[in-house]
């Protein structure tokens, strides 16, 4: 049976395609918008059966042109949290997603989709409950609104619907994302260009570089998606993060030490890196005051209750792997 991945040339979509390939799955229809043509590179080492532009996909899928479809991994969306065109955002992230969902329900195909931790906005609790959901931008709102649709549909759905609220994802195949790429990606490139990594200084009671996020490797994101693909009886909306908040200092320090290791240099402690000017703290920008999350951490209770029991990579493990991968690309 056919598998479909939307956003297939994007960051998470391409990693899911690759993970499916590694399991012997190649009957995959890749759906994307290659107006930004350089994204094609994410699929060069992947095996797919066909490629479709997103503008023609939904109509053809709803018409049954692809025969029996087992599952749709819906990763396609505008993921720029700074986008201010609300009409564009809602059309791409909400209306389009509803159309894909409707086609999946009509055909009995598994629907696994990308939600976002941006739904939580400024909340200090990160649990899949309506009362803690308060998005701060139209991107978060587009994801929030679609999750509300899912909550209404789930009780009567006859096929799987599984949504994943991605936290701060990093890893291979994100180069095309530019400013929206991960902190690890930007730290890597900054250190190679300038010989140092710059982090925000003290803010809101957090020491320099100690603002925290739940940083999750795209390897783990793909594994969770495939776990639910293998268990079509499991539906719901799930946080997808490590359950561990780690500071930006951990990302920067790991980037520095991994690059040093590749140059046959010994590791340094964070204090030594700061002392030697390899990590530099800059004043927290006024423009971000009051709009910046200093802490995120996924509550994994629902994910673990669904049966996913594999460990997640720490920043030290995942970023080390990623930096080595990036170094092999340049």
Curated annotation (Swiss-Prot):
Signal peptide stretch: none
What terms describe the molecular function in GO for this protein?
ADP-glyceromanno-heptose 6-epimerase activity; NADP binding
Active site (record annotation): 139, 177
Please write the reaction equations for the catalytic activity of this protein: ADP-D-glycero-beta-D-manno-heptose = ADP-L-glycero-beta-D-manno-heptose
List the pathway annotation: Nucleotide-sugar biosynthesis; ADP-L-glycero-beta-D-manno-heptose biosynthesis; ADP-L-glycero-beta-D-manno-heptose from D-glycero-beta-D-manno-heptose 7-phosphate: step 4/4
Top-level EC class as recorded in UniProt = isomerase
Instruction: Specify the protein name.
Output: ADP-L-glycero-D-manno-heptose-6-epimerase
User: Which species does this protein come from?
Assistant: Burkholderia vietnamiensis (strain G4 / LMG 22486)
**Gene name per UniProt:** hldD
